[in-house]
């Protein structure tokens, strides 16, 4: 990549280890993933063999305990930021998502699951042999997690689960699903987590065709009197809400990192096209209006990158910083949307052709702006955190 479009991995946030990790990861992505992303996107899936190859490289296990096949010693939150932004360079969010559903489905199990569940599930997922998904959203409840209705009734050594989940990334191919279910009264304290396994009688899934992220399957999950062993309870009954909320802030931070990475890919493609393409006897970049588009894209990207790194550093120090994470994700997805549009204007008709990186990114703007909390939900969350909702 032209150095002009690099993220500068400078101190105090980055070390030589971070730079070595990025170089190694970039070589792997450029050699093993980038040449195939359009093929996988058009096919609507990433082959299982690729999941295993990515795991063998070490990407799947990042941040997970060594005893289960992961690696966490010497890693920090900036390794995850680098991972998100390097995957975003592919301009194929569906591929990145398909290879990363474990990053949201597995942590609750690692934190609160029984030793038996951890030994049975984590190594299989971290080796790329199995896929795990997280199921929260329902047809009648999304960001309002406390309003979830999928019910799990205790009957002896089993829970009987009835209800449905929707918009579940990886839901069609998942071997395991970390599902939020209601085991108690209404509200947050009545929610629990259950590990539900593919093939269990009464558990089915239907695919949801969508605008972007084609390589990542998305599904509605149906639970019809599904018998789930009580041993598959993750944590205590009623602890589900806390486990999920602990996961959400990191998920939003990584979505912001990926959105800024995608915006940077748009800038690179627009700048390279503008330098090569000639109109009216001169290169596009010689037109002031085009140069100003590139500068404005760069300005927004670099501002967002600085906000991202500052917020990540605060999280690394143990701060919750929920308001900043919410505002960061809003800012990052707006930057992605702006840069996708401006890059499309610079590339013209070429940006509308399938196989073009900008074309894929343009289709993926909305899922980034909505997933993990919409702009409206996150703005209101930030307002409450900052005390703007009080008299």
Locate predicted features:
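Alpha-helical interface subdomain recognition
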Residues: 1-89, 100, 112-116, 124, ...
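A short core secondary-structure module
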Residues: 158, 162-206
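Flexible, small-/acidic-enriched active-site or ligand-binding loops
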Residues: 147, 199-229
């Amino acid at each position: 990549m032209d150095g002009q479009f690099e993220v500068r991995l400078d101190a105090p946030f980055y070390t030589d280890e971070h730079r070595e990790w990025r170089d190694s990861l970039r070589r792997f992505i450029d050699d093993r993933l980038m040449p195939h992303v359009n093929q996988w996107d058009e096919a609507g899936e990433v082959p299982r063999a690729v999941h295993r190859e990515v795991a063998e490289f070490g990407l799947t296990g990042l941040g997970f305990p060594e005893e289960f096949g992961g690696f966490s010693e010497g890693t920090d939150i900036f390794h995850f930021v680098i991972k998100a932004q390097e995957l975003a360079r592919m301009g194929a969010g569906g591929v990145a998502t398909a290879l990363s559903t474990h990053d949201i489905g597995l942590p609750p199990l690692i934190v609160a699951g029984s030793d038996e569940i951890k030994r049975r599930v984590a190594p299989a997922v971290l080796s790329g042999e199995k896929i795990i998904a997280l199921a929260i959203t329902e047809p009648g409840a999304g960001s309002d997690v406390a309003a979830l209705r999928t019910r799990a009734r205790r009957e002896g050594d089993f829970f009987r689960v009835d209800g449905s989940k929707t918009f579940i990334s990886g839901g069609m191919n998942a071997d395991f699903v970390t599902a939020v279910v209601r085991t108690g009264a209404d509200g947050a304290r009545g929610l629990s987590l259950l590990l539900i396994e593919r093939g269990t009688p009464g558990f089915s899934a239907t695919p949801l065709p969508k605008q972007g992220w084609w390589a990542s399957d998305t599904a509605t999950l149906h639970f019809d009197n599904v018998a789930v062993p009580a041993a598959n309870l993750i944590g205590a009954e009623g602890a589900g809400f806390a486990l999920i909320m602990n996961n959400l802030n990191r998920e939003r931070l990584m979505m912001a990192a990926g959105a800024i990475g995608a915006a940077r890919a748009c800038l690179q493609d627009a700048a390279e096209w503008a330098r090569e393409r000639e109109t009216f006897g001169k290169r596009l970049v010689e037109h002031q209006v085009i140069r100003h588009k590139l500068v404005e894209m760069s300005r927004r990207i670099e501002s967002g990158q600085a906000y991202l790194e500052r917020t990540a550093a605060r999280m690394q120090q143990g701060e919750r910083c929920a308001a900043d994470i919410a505002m960061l994700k809003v800012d990052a997805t707006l930057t992605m949307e702006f840069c996708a549009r401006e890059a499309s204007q610079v590339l013209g008709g070429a940006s509308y052709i399938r196989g073009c990186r900008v074309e894929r990114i343009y289709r993926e703007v909305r899922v980034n702006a909505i997933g993990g909390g919409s702009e409206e939900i996150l703005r209101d969350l930030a307002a409450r955190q900052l005390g703007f909702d009080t008299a």
